[in-house]
UniProtKB/Swiss-Prot annotation:
<keyword id="KW-0658">Purine biosynthesis</keyword>
<dbReference type="InterPro" id="IPR011761">
    <property type="entry name" value="ATP-grasp"/>
</dbReference>
<dbReference type="InterPro" id="IPR020559">
    <property type="entry name" value="PRibGlycinamide_synth_CS"/>
</dbReference>
<dbReference type="GO" id="GO:0005524">
    <property type="term" value="F:ATP binding"/>
</dbReference>
<feature type="domain" description="ATP-grasp">
    <location>
        <begin position="106"/>
        <end position="318"/>
    </location>
</feature>
<feature type="binding site">
    <location>
        <position position="276"/>
    </location>
    <ligand>
        <name>Mn(2+) 1</name>
    </ligand>
</feature>
<comment type="similarity">
    <text>Belongs to the GARS family.</text>
</comment>
<feature type="binding site">
    <location>
        <position position="288"/>
    </location>
    <ligand>
        <name>Mg(2+) 1</name>
    </ligand>
</feature>
<dbReference type="InterPro" id="IPR020562">
    <property type="entry name" value="PRibGlycinamide_synth_N"/>
</dbReference>
<keyword id="KW-0464">Manganese</keyword>
<dbReference type="GO" id="GO:0009113">
    <property type="term" value="P:purine nucleobase biosynthetic process"/>
</dbReference>
<dbReference type="InterPro" id="IPR011054">
    <property type="entry name" value="Rudment_hybrid_motif"/>
</dbReference>
<keyword id="KW-0479">Metal-binding</keyword>
<feature type="binding site">
    <location>
        <position position="288"/>
    </location>
    <ligand>
        <name>Mn(2+) 2</name>
    </ligand>
</feature>
<comment type="pathway">
    <text>Purine metabolism; IMP biosynthesis via de novo pathway; N(1)-(5-phospho-D-ribosyl)glycinamide from 5-phospho-alpha-D-ribose 1-diphosphate: step 2/2.</text>
</comment>
<keyword id="KW-0460">Magnesium</keyword>
<feature type="binding site">
    <location>
        <position position="276"/>
    </location>
    <ligand>
        <name>Mg(2+) 1</name>
    </ligand>
</feature>
Length: 436
């Protein structure tokens, strides 16, 4: 079977790796990712425009497509491929609004009484926004309605001093159309521990994957600006050290009810659904959805997949998804990023990766926003590569992953604290304090 994987990052490298033993991989990339290039052979094309992607897929006789990035979903690539007779693992443009339109997502929860929602309002009038914020007695979270690459959300107490500073930023979101829409979502700030559950969906049923915790802050100790994700970890039981089985099942139930609601609103949601939750004292609260695999979270779960990825993809597009099994291993993923990331990452700097030594350690290399020219690899201004270590427990995986970073040379940095006992135990104590 011929499968086209759209996307250029470490997430797509992981998707290609999961499919490579069962299918012939074709690739559409924005830059020459060395890991994807290796798996796709000569069957790749460097482009982004939807009509050219569809033409390329048709000319190559592709049987199925797997869409990685959200921008292609918002652009309607799945719809265009389906019109050409090519089914896709990825929702239609309308169904993808669960990610691309935050007001749509919150209204869906309201209309269908899906549990796990939080207090919110959507504004497009700066004066109405000002009146609301003057009386809003919770700490505010400001979210552009549209896509911002994971970097548009600002939270009082983290990035903003108080609700008046939140008002200033929210007004800017409206006036400058940050996220592509002249509107903004204001939500109450929920205190707890964030976690992610990803699920395969055939439009009727979802098959959940192990829970993961991402680390979006740029610097150690959860400090600094929000990034696309500096790394993540998962545990051997599919839960997290602070997450109970009931918490996990409640999150999965929220996701299943969401897929049911989307089906009634837009038609079947076929693809990957990513739920970002805040585990509060009252249980899981839905923070946001992504309409595709998380990056880095995809790299925690895909190396553990025991089931056939090809059969899962076929089940998604055919509407008869069955099940998926995962190895009982923990994982730690650490991103190596250019100096200055995320504000002004060093671009064009050469990096050297001793993949053989990393592989011999049992650690996996996934290339991200780098560009290969001949036998040399150069950074862009974004994340360069991810290292993923599977092991029997989180702390063993962390030690292995950290040791492997020594085999990557260049003007890069990473968060050394992800997956460490100190940071994980801090999460556990935080939840214990909240629940008591």
């Amino acid at each position: 079977m011929k499968i086209l994987v759209v996307g250029t990052g470490a997430r797509e490298h992981a998707i290609c790796s999961a499919l490579a033993d069962e299918a012939t991989i074709y690739s559409v990339m924005g830059n020459r990712n060395p890991g994807i290039s290796r798996l796709a052979g000569n069957s790749l094309l460097l482009l982004k425009l939807t009509p050219k992607v569809v033409r390329f897929a048709s000319e190559k006789g592709v049987d199925m497509a797997f869409i990685g990035p959200e921008a292609h979903l918002e652009a309607g690539l799945v719809d265009a491929l389906e019109e050409a007779g090519i089914p896709s693992v990825g929702p239609t443009r309308d169904a993808a609004r669960i990610e691309t339109d935050k007001s749509f997502m919150r209204k869906l929860f309201e209309d269908y009484r899906i549990p796990g929602s939080i207090t919110y309002r959507v504004f497009s009038d700066p004066e109405e926004l000002r009146e609301f914020m003057e009386d809003f007695d919770s700490e505010a979270v400001v979210k552009p309605v549209g896509l911002t690459g994971g970097k548009g959300v600002k939270i009082v107490g983290e990035h903003l001093r108080d609700n008046m500073e939140a008002l200033k930023y929210a007004t800017e979101v409206i006036e400058k159309r940050i996220g592509g829409h002249p509107s903004v979502v204001i939500e109450e700030r929920v205190v707890g521990e964030e976690f992610t559950v990803q699920a395969f969906s055939d439009g009727e049923h979802i098959v959940p994957m192990p829970a993961v915790q991402d680390h979006p802050h740029a610097y150690e100790g959860d400090q600094g600006p929000i990034t696309g994700g500096m790394g993540s970890y998962s545990d051997s039981d599919g839960l997290l050290p602070f997450l109970t089985q009931k918490d996990y099942e409640d999150a999965v139930e929220i996701m299943q009810r969401t897929v049911d609601a989307i089906r009634k609103e837009t038609g079947p949601y076929r693809g990957i659904l990513y739920g970002q939750f805040m585990l509060s004292a009252d249980g899981p609260k839905l923070i946001e959805y992504n309409a595709r695999f998380g990056d880095p979270e995809a790299m925690n779960v895909l190396p553990l997949l025991e089931s056939s990825m090809l059969e899962i993809c076929e089940g998604i597009v055919d509407g008869n998804l069955k099940s998926a099994s995962f190895m009982n291993l923990a994982t730690v993923c650490k991103y190596l990023v250019p100096e200055g990331y995320p504000e002004s990452g060093v671009a064009g700097a050469e990096i050297k990766v001793d993949e053989k030594k990393i592989e011999d350690m049992g650690v996996i290399t996934y290339y991200a926003a780098v560009n290969q020219e001949d036998d040399h690899i150069y950074t862009s201004s974004s994340r360069a590569l991810a290292l993923v270590a599977p092991a029997d427990d989180i702390y063993s995986a962390e030690e292995l992953c950290e040791e492997a970073t020594a085999h990557v040379k260049g003007r890069l940095y990473h968060r050394r604290d992800i997956g460490t006992r100190e940071l994980v135990e801090k999460r556990i104590k935080h939840m214990e304090d909240l629940r008591s």
